[in-house]
Every structure is written in structure tokens, then in C-alpha cells.
């Protein structure tokens, strides 16, 4: 069953004072099945960030539709967008986006507070989640008291606390060292194995090699995709590297 359907998405920006028009996305089409783990890759300027902003309901396409479980994101009224985003989507960012004056626990629970869940319900969700992510002993600490990897795990817990249908991850390993990267990718693998759908935008071949499918964006369109199939992470890593080389040299996919 498709959880996300992107159909004919186009995004055109006009420069200031009515100057030249920039076509960031031309004609993007793809679907994501429930329980899939999909990575999106492409060179800088290919349209990845624009696409992610549209999928996150932070921006609207010039043309086309984005359907999340039958809901057309492009048709949601502005005053309803924040609540829809909170109830259906979870976000993991490169820079963590934690509030320094909040403990990790308060950061994680913020979406639940905004959704007005009861204290009991929040704690019932928080405790097993913190245990799974290995941050149960850090909940009373502040972001500046923990490592980058621990911050990112707290950010992942915040993304999961509302049991979202889809996790959107934007360069989630970009600010992490090698050890923390391995830990986060392991975490993503575990939550995906439990049925969580993940869509990750990344420059990292290593991060993408943990996904089940990799989409490549070029010049505002989905240029190519690779399915994991029976490939190991190492084999998928090589396939991704070869495709990125082809993209960089202007080759065409047969």
C-alpha cells in the first residue's frame, strides 16, 4: 500500500522584481510504500531540498500533487498545516534543532504537549522510546551537556513520539562523527524493521546504502532508482557510488 504518492510535482521560483524564473523541480513522480526505507540523493542544486520542503508541507508545488495516505498536502489550508504535520510526520534534521533551554525529555515531549496528550500518555510513549534509543539515563540533561550523537537520538525520539506515518530525515548524519553515524543508521534500521516508513535526503553514500531503495534526482526530476534486493550494504554502496559518478559525468542510464 502506498503511503506517499508524488505526482507531476513542479516548482518554479521567480527571482525578485519579476525577473528570471527558476525551475527547481520539473516533473517529479514516485511513490513510497508503507514500511519502506527510501533515500533520495543528487548533486547540490538538483532539487532535493525543494522536494523535501514540499513533502514536509513547508512549501507548495507550482503544479502536481502530494498525497499522504489519501490526504492532498497541497490542498491543506494554511491554518491546518501545523497540526497535520505534527500528527502525520516526524522530522530529523542535520542540526538537531533542539531547544537549549529544554531538557532532552522536554524537547522530545514538545510535539506531544502541543497535541495536548495527557501526562500519563506522554510518559507511556517516552519510556520505551528512550530505552530503545539508549537515552533513558540522559532525559534530564540539556542539549549542551550531551554529545552530537546523543542529541540526534533525542531528535529521533522527538520525531517518533507522535507515532508518525512517515519520518522525513534531512541529512541526519551530516553533523555526526563515524561512531554516531553508525549508531543512528542502526537505529533507523531497527525502527524501519518494526514497520516505520522513512524517507531520507542525504549526500552520504554510507547513509543511503542502509536504505531499501535509493532515488536519484537530477535537474529537477527523478533520474534513476536502485532497489536493494538481495544486495548487502557494501554492494549497495558500490552501486550508489557508480550511479553518482555517472550523474557527475553526465552519463545516461540505460
What do the predicted segments below correspond to?
Residues 71-72, 109, 113, 120-137:
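Conserved ABC ATPase "signature" region
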Residues 135, 139, 159-160:
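ABC ATPase C-loop
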Residues 56:
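Helix-to-loop junction immediately C-terminal to a conserved catalytic motif
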Residues 167-170:
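Catalytic Walker B motif of ABC-type/P-loop ATPase nucleotide-binding domains
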Residues 221-245:
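Conserved beta-strand-loop-alpha-helix hinge in the C-terminal portion
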Residues 64-72:
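Conserved ABC transporter NBD signature motif
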Residues 142-146, 150-152:
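Conserved ABC ATPase signature
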Residues 141-144, 161-162, 194:
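Conserved signature/switch motifs of ABC ATPase nucleotide-binding domains
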Amino acid at each position: 500500500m502506498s503511503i506517499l504518492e508524488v505526482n507531476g510535482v513542479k516548482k518554479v521560483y521567480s527571482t525578485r522584481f519579476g525577473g528570471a524564473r527558476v525551475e527547481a523541480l520539473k516533473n517529479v513522480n514516485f511513490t513510497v510504500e508503507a514500511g519502506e526505507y527510501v533515500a533520495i540523493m543528487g548533486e547540490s542544486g538538483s532539487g532535493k531540498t525543494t522536494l523535501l520542503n514540499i513533502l514536509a508541507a513547508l512549501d507548495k508545488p507550482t503544479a502536481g500533487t502530494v498525497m499522504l495516505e489519501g490526504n492532498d498536502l497541497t490542498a491543506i489550508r494554511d491554518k491546518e498545516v501545523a497540526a497535520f504535520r505534527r500528527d502525520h510526520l516526524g522530522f530529523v534534521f542535520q542540526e538537531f534543532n533542539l531547544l537549549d533551554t529544554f531538557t532532552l525529555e522536554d524537547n522530545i515531549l514538545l510535539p506531544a504537549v502541543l497535541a495536548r496528550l495527557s501526562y500519563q500518555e506522554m510518559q507511556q510513549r517516552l519510556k520505551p522510546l528512550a530505552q530503545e534509543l539508549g537515552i533513558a539515563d540522559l532525559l534530564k540533561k540539556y542539549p549542551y551537556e550531551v554529545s552530537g550523537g546523543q542529541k540526534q537520538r533525542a531528535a529521533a525520539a522527538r520525531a517518533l513520539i507522535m507515532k508518525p506515518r512517515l519520518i522525513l530525515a534531512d541529512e541526519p548524519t551530516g553533523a555526526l562523527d563515524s561512531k554516531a553515524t553508525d549508531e543512528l543508521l542502526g537505529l533507523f534500521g531497527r525502527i524501519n524493521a518494526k514497520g516505520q516508513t522513512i524517507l531520507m535526503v542525504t549526500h552520504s553514500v554510507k547513509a543511503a546504502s542502509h536504505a531499501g531503495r535509493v532515488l536519484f534526482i537530477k535537474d529537477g526530476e527523478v533520474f534513476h532508482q536502485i532497489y536493494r534486493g538481495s544486495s548487502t550494504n557494501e554492494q549497495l554502496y558500490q552501486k550508489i557510488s557508480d550511479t553518482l559518478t555517472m550523474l557527475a559525468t553526465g552519463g545516461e542510464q540505460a
